[in-house]
Amino acid sequence: MIIMIPIYAITWNFRDTPEGFDKIVNNDYNYFESLCKKSSIDEFVILITCNRVEIYAYTRNEIDKDLFKDSLIYNYPESTMHLLRVASGLESMSIGENDIMRQVKEAYELSIKRKTSGKILSYIFKKALNVGKEVRTQTSISRGKTSIPAISLDICDNEYGINNKSILIIGNGKMATDFSRYLKEYRPGNVTIAGRSIDHARNLAVLYGYSYDSIKNLNNLIKNSDIIIAATSAGNYIVKDLGDLARNKYFIDISKPENIDPEISKYARLLSINEIGKILKRNEDEKKGEVEIAEVIINQEQKTIDEKLKEMMLDDVIAMFYKFANNVKKDELEELFLIQDFNDEQKKDIDAMTSSLINKILAPYTNSVKQFIKENKNFDYILNEYKKMLEQFMENIVKKL
C-alpha cells in the first residue's frame, strides 16, 4: 500500500535534466538553501556533486515550483526510492561509484549542523546510507575503478605513466578536487592547480600540498606540464590553438561541454569525456546482474520505510491527544492552585496523579485508534481526516476555555 507523505526529491542532474543542470550547477549551497527557505520547506537536505544538485524535502507547505525551474520533482514514494538509488550508486554516471556515499553522508551531516533536517529526513538518510552499504556488501557493483577521475587516471597511467610526471589540473571544483585526491596514489611529480579564482585554487592546492596559479598563465603552465587535466564547468574551450606546444603531452578532458579543443588530438593524446563515456557504458552493461540484485534490496527497504513512516505519522497524531490533554491539565491545575493553598510536595503529587490519570484514560483509546487506522486499507485518507477532525476539536475546546 502506498501512503501519501510530503517528502520530495528536487533534482537537476546530468541524465534527466542536463540543460537545467548546466544552468544551476555553478550556484553554491547558500543559493539552494535560500530557495528552500523562500518555499517555506520544513526540513531539507541539499546534495551537490559534480553530476547532480538535489534537494530532499519534507514539508507540509506546497512547494513553489517556480523557484525550482528546470528541475525534476519526485513525490513520495519515488522521492525516497530515488535517494536509495543515488546512495547505492545506481544513478551515478559511473554505476556503483563509491564517492556518492561519502557525498550523501556529508550532505546529511551538514543539514544536521545547519539544523535543516528533522526526524523524518534523518530517518530516511540513515536508511539510505545503510542501504548503500548493504548494496556494496551484497553485490560486486562497486568493484574496480568506479569514479570518472579514477578511471581517467588509470587509463592515463597505463598509456603514459603518471609517476614523477608534471601535472596541471585546470579547475578547482568538485571534480578537480577528486582528481587531486586520486592523484596522490600515483606519486606524481609537481602538481599545479589553475583556476579563475586564485584564492579557490590556493585553498584546493594547500589541502594536498600542490602548487597553484592563475588560469591567466595557462599556456606557460601547459608548456611546463606533461599531463593536463581539464575539469571545469566553463561552457567553452579553455585549451585551444596550442599547435606544437601540445606535442608529447597527455590531455584529459572530463568537462561537459568540453574544455579542450578536439583539434589538439592531432598533436597529442586526448582522453575525452566521450571516450570515457563508452567505458562507463561497457561497465554498466557488465554490471546489469548486480544492478538487478541491488534493486531487489532497494525495493525491500522501501517497504520497510513505508511501514516506519506510517508508524511515525500515527505517533504524531496520537501525540496531539496527549499534548492537548496535558495543556488542559496544566490550565486546570494552575486555576486550582490559585483558589486553594497546597505546598510544593502536594502540588507535585497532584501533578503526577493527574498525569497518570490522563495516560490510563487515553492509552486504551489511542491504541485502538492507532491499530484501526494502521490496518485500514485507506490508511492515508483516514489518518488525514482523523487529524483534521482532531485539530478542529481541539480548536473548538480552546475557544470554550
Swiss-Prot record:
Single GO molecular function: glutamyl-tRNA reductase activity
Q: Which UniProt keywords apply?
A: NADP, Oxidoreductase, Porphyrin biosynthesis
Question: Any idea which positions bind NADP(+)?
Answer: G171, N172, G173, K174, M175, A176
Q: Which InterPro entries does the entry mention?
A: 4pyrrol_synth_GluRdtase (IPR000343), 4pyrrol_synth_GluRdtase_dimer (IPR015896), 4pyrrol_synth_GluRdtase_N (IPR015895), GluRdtase_CS (IPR018214), GluRdtase_dimer_dom_sf (IPR036453), GluRdtase_N_sf (IPR036343), NAD(P)-bd_dom_sf (IPR036291), Shikm_DH/Glu-tRNA_Rdtase (IPR006151)
Per the record, the pathway is: Porphyrin-containing compound metabolism; protoporphyrin-IX biosynthesis; 5-aminolevulinate from L-glutamyl-tRNA(Glu): step 1/2
List, alphabetically, the PROSITE patterns matched: GLUTR
A GO biological process held by the record: protoporphyrinogen IX biosynthetic process from glutamate
Q: Which reaction(s) does the protein catalyse, per the Swiss-Prot or TrEMBL entry? A: (S)-4-amino-5-oxopentanoate + tRNA(Glu) + NADP(+) = L-glutamyl-tRNA(Glu) + NADPH + H(+)
Q: Which Pfam families match?
A: GlutR_dimer (PF00745), GlutR_N (PF05201), Shikimate_DH (PF01488)
Which residues are the signal sequence here? none
Q: List, from the UniProt record, the residues annotated as the active site of this protein.
A: C50 (nucleophile)
Residues engaged in binding substrate? T49, C50, N51, R52, S92, E97, N98, D99, Q103
Tell me more from the record: During catalysis, the active site Cys acts as a nucleophile attacking the alpha-carbonyl group of tRNA-bound glutamate with the formation of a thioester intermediate between enzyme and glutamate, and the concomitant release of tRNA(Glu). The thioester intermediate is finally reduced by direct hydride transfer from NADPH, to form the product GSA.
Q: Which HAMAP family match?
A: Glu_tRNA_reductase
Q: How does it assemble?
A: Homodimer.
> Any idea what this protein is called?
Glutamyl-tRNA reductase
Source species of the chain: Picrophilus torridus (strain ATCC 700027 / DSM 9790 / JCM 10055 / NBRC 100828 / KAW 2/3)
